[in-house]
Amino acid sequence: MMAPMTNWLTFSLSPMEMLRSSDQSQFVSYDASSAASSSPYLLDNFYGWSNQKPQEFFKEEAQLAAAASMADSTILTTFVDPQSHHSQNHIPKLEDFLGDSSSIVRYSDNSQTDTQDSSLTQIYDPRHHHNQTGFYSDHHDFKTMAGFQSAFSTNSGSEVDDSASIGRTHLAGDYLGHVVESSGPELGFHGGSTGALSLGVNVNNNTNHRNDNDNHYRGNNNGERINNNNNNDNEKTDSEKEKAVVAVETSDCSNKKIADTFGQRTSIYRGVTRHRWTGRYEAHLWDNSCRREGQARKGRQGGYDKEDKAARAYDLAALKYWNATATTNFPITNYSKEVEEMKHMTKQEFIASLRRKSSGFSRGASIYRGVTRHHQQGRWQARIGRVAGNKDLYLGTFATEEEAAEAYDIAAIKFRGINAVTNFEMNRYDVEAIMKSALPIGGAAKRLKLSLEAAASSEQKPILGHHQLHHFQQQQQQQQLQLQSSPNHSSINFALCPNSAVQSQQIIPCGIPFEAAALYHHHQQQQQHQQQQQQQNFFQHFPANAASDSTGSNNNSNVQGTMGLMAPNPAEFFLWPNQSY
């Protein structure tokens, strides 16, 4: 008869009672020298056995076979003072649990077995009184206690079995001699006649080492005998075995559970994070090589509405940085086309292209490089970094993302030349003109586009040359002479006024650019010419004998002559103000 193969650990959960007195203080140890035995762990009630039913751990054949005692292999002492056997109301003290007692606990070590058979035997052995091994009966199903079930289910080493598992196995004390082993850890508790409660835990999983001829006696009131052999243990159906395997095995994504709590991963994919407020996914790539350039190690590949798109963006960025050695979310064979395209681009250019293909970020960042949304105005602002003492340079606010992206591109070309990483294609800009331009970079960056467009449009329009301007002045002089030679020359003609709106429309053709200095010089010449013509006309109509008759004329004639000399100057009173062009 082999020793039982269970590893039961039982301890009392009730107030301790007085251990029964005994003439012998030596504990009887059992032998666990069988090749397939696993000794039970027993830490039972600290009081004597009060039930009159016969108790035994092994049959008499097993006790006779246990010839070799392990009395010489003591490794630890009992927790109970042997003097407690002589007291009926003794309560255990702290020293009782510190190993200073004279009682001995036997330890069995079998070198022939594959596993080490360690046992913490009974602290109190009822065989001293009944010549039989004792184990407490009247056990109940431990599954009924939800508190212990939740407590032991959290252990990594053992879990509370279901009702089917406990039904297949017999809890501690249900059988007098031997506890039927199960495929998993078992829990049980005992309520004795004295109201005490003992807890048993079976942690033995070696179900293959069975005895074919185990005979057990049921420890109930009927004393029913039960025969259990190895065939009963091997009668598990295939479905039960598959069920046990499925319960243990875990999927590949078990470690990639989505958790919305703070401090945990928010995506099942590598390099992807989920925004806590908006629910959008962003792809991030950590690059340590750019630390020497003053940039942050965390690069952004854009924001996405779907998680798999963000994972693909991370995979492409990782393949660009680390080639085939990169750890990707999807197989590398899925990116064969993209790998060929990224060979002709730098790392920064490829990352910028990934951002442009995204649907924007969650926290105000734009899909364009160097562009962010203002948190109050709602407008888009452009900044460029590492240009002014390793600091950001503010480029202004813009109505659209595209305008802000163009301002960033122009500033990048200005400071970094043809090697600049831009949001749009480089052939969109005149790189040489931008690099030679003296316009400031910053608040005037958004006016740079208008200046370039005005310069481009002026090249297409006809320019008024010096020869054409001289010919035009001669035509205007001829028209003035014709008007002055007319009989009604005293009438006011606004066509003669060089600063009038009518003449300005005739002099300057629509759509022809001009310089303000040249136009002012032209107006001065016309004014001088008009004054000369007026003086000539005045002396021609003045009477010749006005000077000889001046002494003899009366006061009325003098007043009339004086009023005639005070003719209004048309250039002074009838000139329209200069218009701002």
Swiss-Prot record:
PROSITE patterns: AP2_ERF (PS51032). GO terms for cellular component: nucleus. Residues 268-331, 367-425 bind DNA. Pfam families: AP2. GO terms for biological process: ethylene-activated signaling pathway. SMART domains: AP2. It comes from the Eukaryota. Gene3D superfamilies: AP2/ERF domain (3.30.730.10). Disulfide bonds: none annotated. The keyword Phosphoprotein does not apply. Residues 105-132, 205-240 are annotated as: Disordered. Residues 108-122, 218-232 have a biased composition (Low complexity). Probably acts as a transcriptional activator. Binds to the GCC-box pathogenesis-related promoter element. May be involved in the regulation of gene expression by stress factors and by components of stress signal transduction pathways. Belongs to the AP2/ERF transcription factor family. AP2 subfamily. This is AP2-like ethylene-responsive transcription factor AIL6. The gene is AIL6.
